[in-house]
């Protein structure tokens, strides 16, 4: 079970609550009404505003009531933690005040909606609406101190550590400045502040680590002083609450060197005081063994009688001695205890008879298959397989040097042989590269003439198939020559000569020249 209070919605202050609710009402309801409207429409207009305002106030206050946890519904550890940090009575009174204001606003909304049903004019409806919103705002304004307190509680609760109360847990406790935070930093990933003065840790810190492929959490608690319960402050009560409610292996730290400022007798007395809160799973850690160990004490009769029958181990965080051993001892102790508790539980006894151990069938060993292989009569000598002269065959020469085969460069006559090969190739070159002329000069001239004739006929056929005139010219009459564009063939591209442009109408008014169209309009008008 893990509680996380970061989901709580921020609590608005009283004036913020009024501004939010009234602005939402103004935005989400109609805003224009006239006296000449029907009285039923006027009543519905103002009833809608009063209802919406009441719902806005009630929903905002209801969110506060549902988000904050009820002490009776959460784990006792968190219930006592809220009591220590925020005072249980003050916390419940604040939520009760918010609930009373919510009920009062809902009552005001219903009351004024009923009065608006009997209003007989626009003026009376408006005054009833103002009275309703005023009473709602007054009820919200009275929540000023309460909402401030709840916002502080919310901000503090969101910073509380997330502790898995049913998980595997190690709990570290003891006097201030005995080395608890240093141990937590060594075995986990928690960034706990470590300082040479006492009461450095003022709240609960949670670190996580892995042991035997399981996830573990270690809780660092503030230092505790040996004094009556009613005299303990809030910081000490955090440790007392954790010891009382969290099922874990308790690591009680004792500083034998007394550099923490407290004697060994005081630390043993504190252990006896906390003994009712400690479980049977407990390990006493003798810290700062690099300063003074158990063997270096002069009078160790009292401490030995105290440690009799208890699990203990010396440890030094400065020199990192026995840190893993202490962690392993505590973790194994908790694993054994959890295993025994599950075995002895009544719930398991109902199903223990149904559990069967299933083992896989043992397979018979396969007989070796008969493999027919050739018998090796002699060991071949790798040296004899190479084509190397007898006098060089058994020399110890590497095969590969600098990525090159040594045998390629081993022949002393290689240059002479290369020269002979090149001369032989030069002698064979004329024989293989000789060209033969098959045609005589007369036959070659005749061939060229035939090829030229074929090409000439191909060009003539292509020009014959080409159209002499465009298709658009075939359907034009001879008397419409003024509209025919003049085509000029130049560089095998057809260019269209545009007719001369006529002057604009504005310029024609000031010109003596007159331009007539090819078809006058008055001849084709149809009626004079």
Curated annotation (Swiss-Prot):
Q: What is one Pfam family matched by this protein?
A: NOG1
Q: Which residues form the OBG-type G domain?
A: 168-335
The cellular location(s) given in this protein's UniProt record come to: Nucleus, Nucleolus
Q: Where does GTP bind?
A: 174-181, 220-224, 287-290
One GO cellular component this record assigns the protein to is: nucleolus
GO annotation (BP), single = ribosome biogenesis
Would you say which domain of life the source belongs to? Eukaryota
Q: Where is this region: Disordered?
A: 470-528
* Basic residues bias spans: 519-528
Could you tell me the keywords of this UniProt record?
Answer: GTP-binding, Nucleotide-binding, Nucleus, Ribosome biogenesis
Q: Where is the composition biased (Basic and acidic residues)?
A: 509-518
Does this entry carry the keyword Nucleus?
A: yes
GO molecular function terms here?
Answer: GTP binding
PROSITE patterns in the record: G_OBG
User: Matching CDD domains, A to Z?
Assistant: NOG (cd01897)
Cross-referenced InterPro entries: G_OBG (IPR031167), GTP-bd (IPR006073), NOG1_N (IPR041623), NOG1_Rossman_fold_dom (IPR010674), NOG_C (IPR012973), P-loop_NTPase (IPR027417)
Question: What family is reported?
Answer: Belongs to the TRAFAC class OBG-HflX-like GTPase superfamily. OBG GTPase family. NOG subfamily.
* Described purpose of this protein according to its UniProt entry: Involved in the biogenesis of the 60S ribosomal subunit.
Q: What is this protein called?
A: Nucleolar GTP-binding protein 1
Q: Which organism is it from?
A: Encephalitozoon cuniculi (strain GB-M1) (Microsporidian parasite)
**Taxonomic lineage of the native organism:** Eukaryota, Fungi, Fungi incertae sedis, Microsporidia, Unikaryonidae
